[in-house]
Amino acid sequence: MAGEYAHNVLSGKSTKKDMAERQLDADEKSFADSVDRFISGKEKSPMVRVMTTPLVLELTGAEGLPVEIAKTDLEKILNGKHAGDKTPEITKQLPRALTNPIMIFKSYTGPNGEERRVVVVDLKDRNGATIVVPFELKVTTRKNYEINRIASAYGKTKKKSKNPSYEWFNSQLDEGNLLYVNRKKAINEILQRSPNWPMPEGKVDNLLSAPNVANEEDLVKLKSGNP
């Protein structure tokens, strides 16, 4: 009986993991198709669905709402302000990258009081700069339903040279805005950027280990209790 119970528990966990992976696969394909339609001028909807809010964002207080991006913001990413920095193929990787980011920071509130997050994903733009994804949480759309809205996605670069910039990450850590960190990914990111990283390693270690900051172990625990 004990063996059967253990088998059922493990099977249940495996099934939940499989379900989550299938959902992510479906989200990836759907968003990639939307990006292709946008590029070809065939995307008619003003809002494009990206995915369901990843659990890691729920760790920072976000609700499990649909994640969408406005077609106008997709235009800025691919053809406007950030044109040339991010290819469509990089953009298509956002759903998977958002499920396992490097860090998440709290940000200032939006124009209508929306709470905001900035997700630092494990992707680089064409300049080698780490990509950040600003979110507005719990936004009501024109069709009167709530979403977590991606406001943009771009690499943190110096304005003139387009070289990767690290000052923003440094200031966010220093100001105590860190809500979530994958410690292994964050340390690897910082070590790769040395000696350009502006903050002493000892101080970074203390900030990444702060007891009020969720980490990858908390994400594993949350995933184990959710499909």
Regions found by a protein language model. Name each.
Residues 1-227:
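Ribonuclease/tRNase effector modules and their secretory precursors
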